[in-house]
């Protein structure tokens, strides 16, 4: 199967947009290093892969050691060791750790400094009060001692949307030329995002690239035939396709994290953390499929779902 760069971009769009939303969701404390979201994702992907790859081997070792548990001390030691490996690599712990990392990054988990400071007060609050406070955190515009904005998720996304409007110009309102290379053309006329990127690919380059602007006539005809869309609706899709894609993604993103904020209000047990971890992975899968289905059409109208 011929390898196509464009198919890779379909997946990277999701990573880039979520990275752009995550990377500046809030200003970190002076003593706290900025989170490398791409490294975080890769680390949990590796953990999950290692778990799936080693599960059978660990299970077999545990069964053998359990059968020989009373034979000698060596077997007992091996059993304890393998049981510990299974516990460390279990799917529950993997997703629970993932959920805890998400909570800590959003500054609403047990590891968040604000959560620790207000823990005693929140113990006396109802679940609804905790949920309300967490949701208000989405719109957080508090000032720190350094008089910097401690941004919530939504203010950060709003600023990112404002940045999208200005792609093509840098901070000095000048064309950025080809200082930041594009994935396909190795040149770019769009500004480098100050919010970070993944794999050296700028999110503004992707949004402004022909990838999002290319819905061919054959693809539109395919949609028209399958769903009976009128020419007027097709024209609206052409005109507002980028806005529609972004809006759907934003709604999915927002509702998912409202659920996470609610779960964080209930408590921070291993079950809650596990659900949050699974929910976050589910969010990634859904948005990846969304972009693949909406944009993934060849010019002959065939789907390009295989990556």
UniProtKB/Swiss-Prot annotation:
GO annotation, cellular component aspect: membrane
Going by the UniProt annotation, this protein carries glycans at 124, 173
Does Membrane show up as a keyword for this record? yes
The principal localisation class reads membrane
**Statement: the UniProt record of this protein carries the keyword Transmembrane:** yes
Give the record's membrane topology: Multi-pass membrane protein
Query: Ranges of Low complexity compositional bias?
Result: 63-82
Residues passing through the membrane, by range: 244-264, 275-295
Query: Keywords in UniProt for this one?
Result: Glycoprotein, Membrane, Signal, Transmembrane, Transmembrane helix
The positions making up the signal sequence are: 1-25
Q: Where in the cell is it found?
A: Membrane
Q: Could you tell me which residues belong to the region Disordered?
A: 60-90
What superkingdom does the record give? Answer: Eukaryota
What is the recorded name of this protein? Answer: Putative uncharacterized transmembrane protein DDB_G0288661
